[in-house]
Amino acid sequence: QLIERIGDYYFEQCFRRDIPLAPYTRISFATNGQLWFTEEAQHLIRKYHEFLSVTVSIDGVKELHDAFRVDAEGNGSFDKAYAAFQDGKQKYGWMASKMTFVPESTKYLYPSVKMMVEEGCQHINCNYAYEPYYTVEDAREVYRELVKLSDWLIEAAPDDYVSILHAPVGTGMGCDDRNYCGGTGNMLSFAPDGKAYPCIRYAPISIGEEKASRVCLGSCWDGLYATDEQRKTKEMLDSITRSSQSS
């Protein structure tokens, strides 16, 4: 309902102010698919599907997905997510895929990407989570899985794009040392109460109110970087570079 209200307001203002952006607008978001078939969600999809770009997060094969994505009752969420993916694919041609791996899930990397390619996905974004501690043996296992995946892709789907195999990955860093992620304050995330955070990963929904309060950058009511503490946080974020994150 909130997304619908925001969309309604945006398109109404485009019309009222004679702003020509409406036909070119995309409302892009990812979902875990658990509420996909509720009346509220279906109403939004039917109403705005021509402007929507929706990704259903499926981490891979059922064993992998259910091991790391569970619902409030502790049950695996693959079946609902997969049904949502199939519905979006069949009705609207939405086939984007986003996968996140950790050391414990590396053994599923090849079969998981293979599954989504065979489902028709031609552009798959996948990466490893930043939080876990990685060992040299973890790197060796990732390499072995990527070799298997690459060999299969060359034969079965040579034109498909898998981000973890993107050519520049692993090459030397160029002259531009700017942080490549918007999570240092270049792409703010706003919570429902109007407070601003450097990224959704720093918002209360991700790390809880106590931790999130330490990196709050202001709000839509009081402005950004209005206090000394907020300005110090901005200074810290601005100092983050690609090389500083790798050292």
Set out the residue ranges of the language-model regions.
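Radical SAM/AdoMet-radical enzyme domain recognition
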Residues: 2-128
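Flexible glycine/acidic-rich beta-alpha junction loops that bind and position SAM and/or redox cofactors
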Residues: 63-68, 123-142, 162-176, 203-211
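Histidine/acidic residue-rich metal-binding segments in metalloenzymes
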Residues: 82, 141, 145
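C-terminal accessory region of radical SAM enzymes
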Residues: 144-172, 202-246
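Short, small/polar residue-rich loop motifs at catalytic or cofactor-binding pockets
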Residues: 181-185
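Short, acidic, Ser/Thr-enriched surface-loop or helix-capping motifs
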Residues: 191
